[in-house]
């Protein structure tokens, strides 16, 4: 059997051995339970997250692989052990998303989030933008047998130095969100992990752009449609989260 399905508390992890892909769908406890950055004005203290039944109809989160393995060699990830075997085709990307939706058995949901964040660096795959647009057309067609009222695909990027088309990809992604995304547009997450450049270089093995270079690219991008771009950090006691450095490198308005 080429497809192995592992059930989780709120969804399934799908491993397609024949295609060499892994993807999943889960429910979501809601953004109100996420820890926010106080320097951005998010001061709510999270004491606990109430255990409750997650309803997939309210928010279905599908996470897919954009590549088979990954050309990045991050020291915190197992993907380098698999090697790199190329980009997922546009048909393959759409298949991951539609298969996950089909297995969820959701026909008409409130919100669909698609995260290009499982295996691979999505900005290396030019078909990611087109696949996200095609999914928008499928689920927002009133005559479709599967529909969602809101749609929010998200690209999570490590900002690779070697991607000569990085700026164009990010520009195309943000602009596509204005036309094909819901009120939040298309989401964009940057894997920063720490504000210490030496630690970042160790984590990403020197394959990610510097903080200044990332900040400069973000400043050149169109403004997000509504939801601001996200900076992701690996929060530990040793992680540098200096708010002054955040202000130095990154535009709070974006």
Indicate residue ranges for each PLM-predicted region:
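Flexible, acidic/Gly-rich N-terminal and inter-domain linker regions that tether
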Residues: 1-60, 64, 72
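Generic detector of contiguous secondary-structure segments
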Residues: 8-12, 78, 116-119
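Acidic-residue sensor for enzyme active/binding pockets
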Residues: 22, 96, 121
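Glycine-centered small-residue hotspots that permit tight backbone geometry or close packing
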Residues: 29-31, 39-42, 69, 80-84, ...
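Ampiphathic alpha-helical segments that act as solvent-exposed interaction surfaces
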Residues: 49, 87-91, 99, 103-104, ...
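Canonical Radical SAM [4Fe-4S] cluster-binding loop centered on the CxxxCxxC motif
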Residues: 54-99
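Conserved AdoMet/S-adenosylmethionine-binding subsite of the radical SAM
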Residues: 102-113, 118-254
